[in-house]
A protein has these predicted regions:
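Basic nucleic-acid-binding alpha-helical/helix-turn surface characteristic of O6-alkylguanine DNA
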Residues: 1-106, 155-165
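Regulatory, non-catalytic segments
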Residues: 109-118
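Short, solvent-exposed alpha-helical "recognition" segments
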Residues: 117-122, 137
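…primarily DNA-binding HTH/wHTH and HhH modules…
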Residues: 133-165
Length: 165
């Protein structure tokens, strides 16, 4: 059975992204405006082509219940990514808090690794996970993380990555 992969450009607080989906849910989110580059990267990742849709994605990037295509995501990563979907906009958890939430106390670094492999950022809000003493990392860059957090009403973030009250 074909996956019916499609994609469309979407504007977000961090700038334009491409959102790809199929019959199983959203499968890839990537910033940019170069459709040919996105299509090539999708094909490299999934081994199949993706077609540009004439319409928008079937779900909003702000929908916390948007279906996600979890196929191929390792169990630990899926546990992390599922857990962070519970973080409401305007809030954040530390890497350690996420580890505790999935019953893996002391696995903060492993949580960071799972977040770095998140192929659907924004849909699965890895930007809402921060370091205990600062902003932490973000696969799409710290400017994007700041923009997403600010758009959701999170407390101000200083240039050095420290969180401000």
């Amino acid at each position: 059975m074909a996956d019916n992969d499609a994609y469309a450009p979407v504007d977000t607080p961090m700038g334009p992204v491409f959102v790809a989906w199929n019959d199983h849910g959203v499968c890839r989110v990537e910033p940019g405006t170069d459709a040919a580059r996105f299509e090539a990267a999708f094909n490299d990742q999934f081994g199949r082509p993706v077609t540009r849709s004439d319409g928008p994605p079937p779900t909003s990037t702000a929908d916390p219940d948007a279906p996600v295509d979890w196929r191929g995501v390792p169990p630990f990563d899926r546990a992390v990514l599922t857990a962070i979907r519970a973080i409401p906009p305007g809030d954040a958890w530390t890497y350690g808090e996420v580890a505790e939430a999935i019953g893996k106390r002391g696995a903060a670094r492993a949580v960071g690794g799972a977040l770095g492999r998140n192929r659907v950022p924004v849909i699965v809000p890895c930007h809402r996970v921060v370091a205990a003493k600062g902003l932490g990392g973000f696969g799409l860059g710290l400017d994007a993380k700041r923009a997403l957090l600010a758009a959701e009403g999170y407390p101000a973030v200083a240039d050095q990555g420290r969180l401000l009250p």
